[in-house]
Amino acid sequence: PTSEVLVIAGMSGAGRTTAAHALEDHGWDVVENMPPALFGTLAELIARSPEAFPRLAIVVDVRSRSYFEELYAALQHLANSGVEYRTVFLDAEDHVLLQRFEAGRRPHPMQGNARLLDGIRAERDVVEPLKARADVVVDTTELNVHGLATEITELFSESGPVTLRLTIM
């Protein structure tokens, strides 16, 4: 048996937590905000006992270039340990991320004393290389929470895409 491993990254406010909850609802084990330093240990555990981790999603939050470099090294370690994984990147247009942060009345993690939009742009600069390497990019600009959950379910549920069956009598 092999493990199905997803590494989920993306812009703050693009829906990583919503994606994690959707995966949990469909039987995935989810680890949120795991430091890259622990990837090596996790890779060894998965390689040793893949049946213990049939479907594992690791949600990462890349907030600095050094974190990105650490994450990339950790992903290499996963691959070198024989663990196959896919990366999913969640994104949305800046104006939508801005609206989401304003609606939630929360500061952007990279904002500091600058404007909210500056924080979003700083994060985009840092995560762009990860987006370029992602296996799947999901644009959440036009999606609400339920739409994103449906999209994630269709992409990664065991049964494949969810379909509507209509029976007319």
Question: What is each stretch, according to the model?
Answer:
Residues 3, 26, 52-55, 81-86, ...:
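Short glycine-/polar-rich loops that comprise or flank the Walker A/P-loop
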Residues 8:
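Hydrophobic anchor at the beta1->P-loop junction of P-loop NTPases
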Residues 11-14:
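P-loop (Walker A) phosphate-binding loop of NTP-binding proteins
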Residues 16-30:
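A conserved segment at the C-terminal end of the G1
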Residues 26-76:
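Conserved nucleotide-sensing/catalytic segment adjacent to the nucleotide-binding pocket
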Residues 33, 58-61, 88-91, 138-139, ...:
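Conserved beta-strand segments of the P-loop GTPase G domain that flank and frequently precede/overlap
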Residues 83-128, 136, 140-141:
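A glycine- and Lys/Arg-enriched "phosphate-lid" helix/loop adjacent to the NTP-binding pocket
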Residues 118-169:
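C-terminal accessory "lid"/substrate-recognition subdomains
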